[in-house]
Amino acid sequence: MAPLKLNSRNLAQIFAAGKDRVKVPTYQRGSAVKEGIVHVGVGGFHRAHLAVYVDQLMQNHGVNDYAICGVGLQPFDAAMRDALRSQDHLYTVIERSAKGSFAHVVGSINSYLFAPDNREAVIAKMAHPDTHIVSLTITESGYYYNENTHELQAEHPDIQFDLDPANEKTPRTTFGFLYAALARRHQQGLRPFTVLSCDNMQKNGSITRHMLESFARLRNPELAKWIAEQGAFPNAMVDRITPQTSPTDKKALAETIGIEDSWPVVTEPFMQWVLEDQFSDGRPPFEKAGAQVVKNVHDVEQFEKHKLRLLNGSHSAIGYAGQMAGFEYVHEVMEHPLYNRFVWQMMQEEVKPLLPEIPGVDIDEYCKTLMERFSNPTIMDQLPRICLNASGKIPQFIMPSIAEAIWVTGPFRRLCFVAAAWFRYLNGIDDSGKTFNVDDPMREELQAKARAGGTNPAELLNVKSLFGDDLRSDKRFLQEITTAMEAIARDGIMKTMPKYVD
């Protein structure tokens, strides 16, 4: 039997054909529901995470006023627009584990707006009374956050464009859209919507608040005061490994489940969301779908710290050292005994001692679970995805652990090796001489500095938007990272790593 094209009309047939291997939405969609959430940045992670939580609320708990309107701000978002619109905004989540695969058709995304087509439509949608939450997955670079000063990059050309009152109806950045929509709600006497960051950053809500309030103060101090007093920006820890979808994934879905999907999502069974209960205009009962909703922002920060330092820090170790050694997938790296031991020892000996205890959380078990997740061969998680946008990741995932280890005189050799591997990676040439693309918003600047610096870290450490003054002046750190850089340049990753494994 030929695969069925995914759309509303074919859902019943898809369910019948898939039997116990596929789940489909049976709730109402379209004009029968209200779109209470506008989500900016509809990629794989959003569709495997927040959209799945909302789908469960709509399917199992009758929530019909928090369907999602997706928004794409960038020209490349046209591909997602076309894929979703061609199948009534439905898509398939494929969960893969050692036990097999399970398909789940998700219907919580009810519509999609492509800003380059109609920027006014996006502003109007955010400003609409039915909109209670504007959620974000815009990656670290989308926040225009200076890691060194912790301030808005107000001098950035796109921010400067959006700060010009003449451009209020044609913004470029997320903050330009948020500002325009909130200004309109303020004029209409509505409450501000909650701005909910779902990006993988520590204190993501606090950073979002500070960036938006800073932007608003430069435009209209009165509106900035209203946002500060009445707005809400929950902090959240998000977790679900979601690799890029490949043509092989689409083919397998068609052949094994019988679904023809333009852009399915492949992910793992594990999913976690720890969310601060701070909302300005209502929220759905996320906890009924499995989210951990907490009252104290400190609780979120503790979970965030565990996840960013252990999971994402280890991902960085796997990604940059793995790419330099010619590996292609995360599980391949973890199958190599040397890398496997390196990751485990870095977590246990250098990162874990720096982390706070969380009641009910066994850090050793968490680390073991991470090793199992990294080793899952069925999701085929590509190293280029892990390496993407490192300038927004390394300062969060690796450097804070190094700084804290120095402060408490703890070990940090392996963490320095990871930073050195990234510095070497920035050259765009692996240890066999093969070139690869360094996909980073700061690529030109960082690549030039990496090549100019060679085995001297000073050129890169002088990028003040990424690295603070303390590390640049610490002799222990400079000695460790220089030693690692020299060894990697001379001997390559594979011959250097044994020096960092007990």
UniProtKB/Swiss-Prot annotation:
The UniProt entry, under Gene3D superfamilies, shows: N-(1-d-carboxylethyl)-l-norvaline Dehydrogenase, domain 2, NAD(P)-binding Rossmann-like Domain
Q: Which Pfam families match?
A: Mannitol_dh, Mannitol_dh_C
Q: Which domain of life is it from?
A: Eukaryota
This chain's protein is named Mannitol 2-dehydrogenase
Q: Tell me, what is one Gene Ontology molecular-function annotation carried by this entry?
A: mannitol 2-dehydrogenase activity
Where along the chain is NAD(+) bound? 37-48
For the protein in the UniProt heading, the enzyme class is: oxidoreductase
Provide the species name.
Answer: Aspergillus terreus (strain NIH 2624 / FGSC A1156)
